[in-house]
Structures are given as structure tokens and as C-alpha cells.
Amino acid sequence: MKWSYTPEIKGVSFKVDLQELVDLCLPSCSFLATRETFCVVNSILKERLLLLLAWTGKYVFWNVYGDCDNFGMLTGHTNAITDMHFSTDGTVLYTASADKTVMCWDTTSGTRVKKLKGHSSFVNCVHSARRGPSLVVSGGDDCTVLIWDVRKKRPATTLQNTFQVTAVTFNDTSEQVISGGIDNDMKVWDLRKNGLLYRMRGHNDTVTGLSLSPDGSYVLSNAMDNTVRIWDVRPFAPQERCVKIFQGHQHNFENILLRCSWSPDGRRVAAGSSDRHAYIWDTTTRHILYKLPGHNGSVNTVEFHPKEPIIMSVSNDKQIFIGEIE
């Protein structure tokens, strides 16, 4: 499939008719920022396509169904935003920042609900629990993994790592946390015992992104060794937990924390790349399905829409592309 372009669109002055996307070449539309480099993008919140852009200390919401409405801006962080994640129901947004804090935002009102302090250095990653209590995990340059009960301002649990933590996520039951860092290892922490349960070794460089599969059985990792891997995190899995390795994308001297993601049906995985392409692989064959060009800088994040066959990619070139993949 050819990846071609509509004319570049600045700001929010355009329309997207999802009924017509099947007849369009990709991407269907693009955003061009006028400020600092984008860090994060995500698409969630019920059945709408919600585009959320981040630059230094700020988030802007755009609804890109029909008339493109800029319907909110969140301000509060005093340094770069490094990561974000929505709650399962889409009502709360959790953000991590180089200002050493994690913030919780009400996505309906656009107000800050909580400011979580506990890290002593940059916070690199944040993730909320998929089910169970309202827990959030964050990791930072202070070599800690912090577990937060969002009803309180101080961390409920501190897990001490040896090196800086660059990626975190919960397992499906929210009884374990998976972390990755500059020591190349992925660690699974037992929250009932507040200790390390086991390690998963295989990457030869910093782990930059983690994503739990839709069924909760596997975790996807992206690393600076230029591999994306799938790991079996089910109880009583074989000792060799790395079950798939995907190659083709690249990391470079910029050492950006490139993230990764699953498609809603678990049949595809995606990752950003420093070679200016967005990569999508088939999880069964491990073949590259799409190598999508167009960006003029490292692609930091590639996200799947939760309902439609649509992806969004975000890059250091201050652009976000939205397009159909099938």
C-alpha cells in the first residue's frame, strides 16, 4: 500500500470524514505544531478519535471526527512531559514530567485532580492499572518504581531499582508491575510482597517502551538494540519468556524513548523509529506489514485507534499523521 499525502494542514482547520477513509491514500491528515517537539500521542475515550498532543508542559485536545475541534488545554507541568496514559474508562489522564511529578487530570472538565510528588529526579514513564483499584505506576531517573493510590498524594509503595527506569506497565491483574531501564533487563515486581519476582533478559540496550497485550498474556518491549520483543508474562510460563523478536526499526544517537503498542485485536504491533518511519509488524509471521514514511524526524510513538483501522504517528518534526492501514 502506498503512503502518500494530502497537503499539509496547520492548526485545526480541516475535516475528516471517517466514512471516506477507505478510499484515501495515507495519511489522511496531518498536524503541524508551532511550538516545541511533540512527546506523546494517544487515541482513546469511548468511540471518538481523540488526539492529544504534548509539548513542554502542556497538552492540547483535538477531536478529529468531522469539524476538528480544539476543545481543551491542560497546563501545570513546569518541564517537559515525558509520558501519558488514560485510565481504562478514559475519564482520567495521567502524565509524567521532567519536573519530577505525576499529575492526574479530569478529561471531562480539563482540571487537575491530583499532583503526585515522590520522585527526586525526572519521571520518564507512567501507566495506570487496567483493572482493580485506582493504581498508577511511574518510573524515573532516581532509579525507583513508585506505586500510587490516586486517592493519596504520597506513593503507596517504592520499589528500588539499580538503574534509571525508562518504561513501566501493570500486568492484567494489577498484582504485578513490569519495568524496563538502562540496565537492559525487564523486571517483574510482585506488589503483594513489594519485591522482585523475576527478570526477563534478552535486550542488549536500554528498554524504551512497554505495552501489555489486549488479553494480558504478553508484554511488548522496544529497546535501543533495535529489536521489539514479545514476552510471555503468564504464571507458570516457560523459563524462556521471550517468544517473538521483531526487527527493522532503528534507534540512534538521540537516545529518545521510543514507545510501542498493540493493535486492539493483538494481531499487530507497532513502534516508532529514528529512521523517520512508523513500523507495524504481524505478530504471527513477524513480517513488517507497513513501513510508513513521511516524517522528517524520529517517530516517537505509533498508536492504534481502539475501534477503527487507523493509526497515529508522532515525530520530533512537530507533526502528527493520521491514516488508515487497511
Which residues does each PLM region occupy?
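Long, intrinsically disordered, low-complexity acidic/Ser/Thr/Pro-rich regions
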Residues: 1-15
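Conserved strand-to-loop turn within each blade of WD40 beta-propeller repeats
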Residues: 53-56, 95-99, 138-142, 173, ...
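Loop/turn segments within WD40 beta-propeller blades
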Residues: 41-47, 85-90, 96, 127-133, ...
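Blade-level signature of beta-propeller repeat domains, shared across WD40, Kelch, NHL, RCC1
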Residues: 303-326
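Per-blade loop-tip surfaces of WD-repeat and WD-like beta-propellers in eukaryotic adaptors/scaffolds
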Residues: 11-12, 17-27, 61-81, 87-91, ...
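Loop/turn-rich, solvent-exposed surfaces of beta-rich toroidal or solenoidal domains
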Residues: 251-280
